[in-house]
A protein has these predicted regions:
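N-terminal segments that mediate ammonia production and transfer
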Residues: 1-211
């Protein structure tokens, strides 16, 4: 097939052409926290459908996700329903996990994480099962869907907020990852959280009820 050589036009440069996934970013320039920012980010994801892969059934994708600033207001309310007291904003970290479907293996992995957290001088606050809608997934994605859970970890009083706390969380994460090979840590931070999965771009907002 003949290759079409494109000339420079405006800001376009052929040398910057790549066959990769799409990416987008949305921020509020005044730093105002709003669900509108999340909604706009999800629209960007949905507009990048042409950059995403699909399997033969047309209902299972090759992966899509979104990274968000942790909403203290949202998680304080969600955790209260679970009987988890998370304290003040950025005084806690959230780990997002893909656990195995097997109940015993999942219980073992959760217990191992709790032990590691305590060993690192952090306080484990509790688990929250992430509310999802499996019905929107394709057959293949639904068959291998992990158990998605969030862990809440309290910041020690003698540790500063922000990077210092996140470093401590990272150490706990890495130790857990090296000790367990059947659980995937999606994210772990006191500032950001990631929601993602092997589904189509339009399924991201409908699969995760948190969004």
């Amino acid at each position: 097939m003949k290759e079409v050589i494109k000339e420079r036009q405006g800001l376009y440069r052929q040398e910057f052409e790549h066959d990769n996934c799409g990416i987008g970013a949305v921020v509020n320039i005044k730093g105002k926290k709003s669900h509108d920012t999340v909604a706009n980010a999800l629209r960007i994801v949905e507009n990048l459908d042409h950059r995403a892969g699909k399997d033969a059934e047309g209902k299972t994708g090759d992966g899509v996700g979104i990274l968000l600033q942790i909403s203290h207001k949202f998680f304080k309310k969600a955790c209260k329903k679970e009987g988890i007291e998370i304290g003040q904003e950025r005084e806690y970290g959230i780990g997002q996990f893909f656990f195995p479907q097997h109940e015993i293996k999942r219980a073992q992995a959760k217990k191992m994480f709790e032990i590691i957290v305590e060993k690192e001088g952090l306080e484990f606050l509790g688990w929250r099962e992430v509310p999802v809608v499996p019905e929107v997934l394709g057959h293949k994605a639904r068959e291998c869907m992990p158990c998605i859970m969030q862990a809440f970890i309290k910041k020690p009083d003698d540790l500063e907020k922000g990077i210092a706390f996140d470093r401590k969380l990272y150490i706990a994460r890495r130790e857990f990852e090296q000790s367990n090979d059947n659980t995937y840590v999606v994210s772990m931070s006191s500032r950001t959280i990631v929601y993602k999965g092997m589904f189509l771009v339009g399924q991201l907002r409908t699969f995760f009820e948190d969004l």
